[in-house]
Regions:
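Glycine-rich, basic loop-to-helix element that forms the pyrophosphate-binding segment
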Residues: 66-83, 96
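Short aromatic/hydrophobic "clamp" motif used to bind/position activated sugar donors
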Residues: 88
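Catalytic binding pocket for nucleotide-activated donors in carbohydrate/polymer assembly enzymes
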Residues: 505, 618-694
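Membrane-interface aromatic/basic loop that binds lipid-linked glycans or pyrophosphate carriers
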Residues: 274-350, 376, 380, 740
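Conserved catalytic-core segment of nucleotide-activated headgroup transferases in glycan assembly
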Residues: 125-127, 366-382, 495-496, 506-586, ...
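Donor-binding/catalytic cores of nucleotide-activated saccharide
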Residues: 93-204, 211-227
Length: 741
């Protein structure tokens, strides 16, 4: 087998939301002489499974799994040890190659006579998907037709010091035994070392890689003293240059490297996302010590680099006007604050109540969904905790007896929001709530995403009307934990709500009921709804459509009820965005349907039904955990997927995409039920694949996992019960055996 031209090494840990794009960007290159070495750094997310799937599908992919987490540097080193290509390229798991990049790199390498190192251009993409050019373009353009060494052109040492903007001959790497360091800023020794060791360096003035600038969620974006490590990296680099023959011995090269180090370290110190304000004096002190120690002959340190007091006064003078304007704006707004908001400010100064948990669901609509399941389990496993629910005035009468609740924006509301140790929500608290550092916020979400969510909505204006993406990011920045019921959700949440929370693969607590309900419970729920024994109950729950005002049933419910005929009962539940509907009330009055829109528990409705008739609602993912038949109504799929955007083709008919039979109108739906196809073997096969993809963690223990991990501090999550070993609530025809005799 011929040696590949390039070995592209991709370390992966906690990047499952971006990893597929990264790997695809390599494998879809027009240039074919590539091996892709993907290294799973002992990730507890879905990175390893993604890598294995790609390796199984493409022989060019080499999957490596480290036995213990080592960080990006050791993961890259492991990849290098398995590389067989002529040139090494490195790509982070959340970055990606530009189309045609490898072909362009290959062409430039050949034109330059196979140099030791090729530097190429990059761009940067931010959370808004805005692209920014690099500061290296001018240098790369100026040297696009030359070959040089670092001593000839020392300015090459000022090119962005990253592992992913250069191709390095593997024999050079092995001859000098280069290796990435262990810990933060692992690439400093390597990126400069290869340039200083290279006998021939060339440049390519073409963007070959896009660097995804993460706002939060990676080690480089978490502030802390671990960023001090970069000073030690440069100290070691300068010491190496002084004591070895790795080139760079000329004063010009040392001067360029010195100036680069000063600029870069100062930028790191000034970055609020890296060095906290309280740590800056110490960082500056170590920075100044480094620069004094390795200052080239004749060079003088500017006053702001020699003294933190001088630096601070200069920085303060430069920002005083901005800060003054900001204070004036804040003062203007503060005059409009309510008495309760001032009361909230006072409460924020009081100690945290370590035993207080605040719950909310669906923008304060009541005791519902996964927060309700967590609350119930906390009462059982952590009775020392006191739970308080936030509700609005319309729903305060719906609070069950024995459950403590506060009205949103009341005096008590501001008190508990300021002092609770734990905050649990499936949506968002008010934007005026500011989470204290000591508080722990659990975001449960309220459904697996079929439709585009979060930052992905920017491409879908019909769905994004009234959405503040800045506020959305502010909300995500408050989360400490984000619950996930499947790897698909984990990937989506990480990408569309970019921040530094921890994702917990717990399953959805609201679905625990499906595994704790008995046949007697099923009979009781059906009787309470008025469903006659032996009746086939079909739960119809259409989703909200952003391109329509109000509830417009996609199906003619009267025609459907008539087509179904005797022995069938339609349970119709509108989306919670809508209020009471007179058309449904009229149909219910004449016995055509049961309007269950205001029923407090969608879980009860699922348990009472024999089948789900859905369109594009996330309820289908929860219902699949019950392992009961699902029929998809598809009439406006094209309009929905173009207006809202979707993550996969629900109607593809492929296992894992489609949960059951698909029908386009009322007659097709009725025909499916009359023929028995709604629950046939093909339906079961589709449902099984759908469950495997979207219900891997839903095993009845989700709420317990959350309580034990978050409230009780247990590190290890309870193991997941395999799909084949789970016992779900019996379907009605088994719960009512006599009725079917």
């Amino acid at each position: 087998m011929a040696m590949p031209r390039f070995s592209v090494i991709v370390p992966a840990r906690g990047v499952q939301g971006f990893l597929r794009h990264c790997l695809d960007s390599v494998l879809t290159q027009s240039f074919e002489g590539v091996e892709l070495i993907a290294v799973d750094d002992c990730s507890d997310g879905g990175d390893g499974a993604i890598i294995d799937a790609y390796a199984a599908a493409d022989p060019r992919v080499v999957a490596l799994h480290l036995e213990r987490p080592g960080g990006v540097g050791p993961a890259r080193n492991a990849g290098v040890r398995h590389a067989t290509g002529e040139y090494l390229l490195f790509l982070d798991g959340d970055d990606f190659l530009a189309p045609g990049a490898l072909a362009a790199v290959d062409a430039r390498l050949r034109a330059a006579g196979e140099p030791d190192v090729l530097l190429f251009d990059h761009d940067r993409i931010d959370v808004w998907e805005k692209r920014h050019g690099s500061a290296d373009r001018e240098f790369l353009e100026a040297h696009a037709d030359t070959v040089f060494t670092a001593e000839d052109v020392p300015e090459c040492l000022a090119v962005l010091p990253a592992s992913w903007n250069r191709a390095v001959r593997r024999d050079l790497w092995e001859a000098h035994r280069f290796a990435f360091a262990d810990g933060p800023y692992d690439d400093v020794p390597v990126v400069f070392g290869v340039l200083l060791a290279a006998a021939r360096i060339a440049c390519l003035d073409q963007v070959c890689v896009t660097w995804r600038k993460r706002r939060r969620g990676s080690a480089s974006t978490v502030p802390g003293r671990h960023h001090f490590a970069v000073i030690g990296r440069y100290d070691a680099l300068f010491r190496t240059l002084a004591g070895t023959g790795l080139g760079g011995g000329t004063e010009a090269a040392r001067g360029v490297l010195f100036a680069h180090a000063a600029r870069r370290l100062l930028r790191i110190m000034e970055d609020d996302g890296r060095v906290r304000a309280g740590d800056r004096p110490d960082f500056h002190r170590e920075l100044a010590r480094l620069l004094r120690r390795h200052r080239p002959a004749g060079a003088e340190l500017p006053a702001h680099l020699n003294s933190y007091a001088v630096y601070r006064s200069m920085r303060h003078a430069g920002t005083l006007r901005h800060r003054t304007a900001k204070k004036l704006r804040a003062r203007k707004h503060s005059t409009a604050r309510s008495v309760y908001r001032r009361y909230y400010g006072l409460q924020l100064r009081r100690p945290i109540d370590e035993n207080l948990v605040v719950y909310a669901a669906y923008w304060n609509r009541g005791v519902l969904c996964s927060p309700a399941a967590i609350h119930a389990k906390a009462r059982e496993l952590a009775p020392h905790l006191r739970g308080v629910w936030v509700v609005d005035r319309r729903h305060r009468e719906d609070v069950p007896p024995g459950v403590e609740a506060v009205l949103v924006n009341s005096r008590r509301y501001w008190e508990v929001m300021a002092r609770a140790k734990y905050l649990v929500n499936n949506a968002n608290f008010s934007g005026t709530v500011h989470k204290r550092p000591e508080q722990i916020y659990v975001q449960t979400h309220h459904g697996t995403p079929l439709k585009k969510m979060g930052m992905d909505l920017r491409r879908h204006p019909a769905a994004a009307q009234g959405v503040s993406f800045l506020r959305m990011l502010d909300h995500a920045d408050q989360w400490d934990y984000c619950l996930s019921s499947n790897p698909h959700s984990t990937e989506v949440w990480q990408r569309v709500y970019p921040s530094d929370y921890e994702t917990l693969p717990t399953g959805y607590p609201r679905n625990d009921r499906y595994f704790a309900t008995t046949a007697e419970d099923v009979r009781r729920i059906r009787a309470g709804l008025g469903i006659a024994p032996g009746t086939t109950a079909i739960l119809y729950a259409p989703t909200h459509r952003d391109y329509e005002r109000g509830f417009n049933p996609p199906l003619d419910l009267e025609r459907l009820a008539e087509a179904l005929g005797e022995g069938y009962q339609l349970l119709v539940r509108t989306h919670y965005f809508y209020g009471a509907d007179s058309r449904l009330a009229a149909l219910e009055e004449v016995g055509r349907i049961l309007d269950v829109s205001r029923h407090p528990s969608v879980e009860d409705l699922a348990l009472a039904s024999d089948a789900l008739l859905c369109d594009f609602s996330s309820l289908m993912f929860d219902y699949a955990a019950l392992d009961r038949p699902i029929v998809v109504h598809s009439s406006d799929w094209e309009a929905y997927r173009h207006a809202r955007g979707v993550y996969f083709d629900l109607l593809s008919g492929e296992p894992g995409d489609t949960p059951g039979h698909v029908a386009g109108d009322e007659q097709e739906i009725a025909a499916l039920f009359h023929s028995g196809r709604w629950s046939d073997e093909h339906s079961a096969q589709l449902r099984t694949a759908f469950r495997e993809r979207f219900c891997p963690y839903d095993d009845g223990l989700a709420a317990e996992r959350v309580v034990r991990r978050v409230f009780l501090g247990e590190e290890d999550l309870l193991p997941v019960v395999p799909l084949t070993e789970r016992t779900v609530a019996p379907p009605p025809h088994k719960a009512e055996p006599c009725a079917q005799a």
